Amino acid sequence: MILIVTNKEDTHPTPVIEHLTKSGVPFFRFNTECLLTDYAIEWFCINNIIDFSITNTITNTTILGSQIKSIWERRPEKPNKSNATDPTANKICLEEANAFLVDLQYSLKNIFSIGSAVYDNVAASKL
């Protein structure tokens, strides 16, 4: 399965997604700015194998980390909205969500990708 990492405003993946759909190639579009509002993420261990799932709660589609065979990191953006009503809690949620995305990118760095925040911006990383 192809993980397409982008944002809601990016229209460039649309023709690619249409082609993938016609060709029967499984994919999952992950709009990173909506991480806290449109997605549910779970980490789990089954039979001593660690995996994770990302579910789009709007479309009810899910991808397992173990299903990801390639990644197209198109235009990810930092999460910009949470369901927290308290301003301090909202700030913390957004900071934690951004840190999670960085960790996710590093955990997937050995999967074939087009575009990579890990390798394309090495000098910019503070990790």
Positions of PLM-derived features:
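Short hydrophobic/aromatic-enriched beta-strand-loop microsegments
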Residues: 24-30
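Conserved N-proximal alpha/beta basic substrate-recognition cap immediately N-terminal to
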Residues: 7-19, 30-127
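Extreme N-terminal starter segment of soluble prokaryotic enzymes
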Residues: 1-3
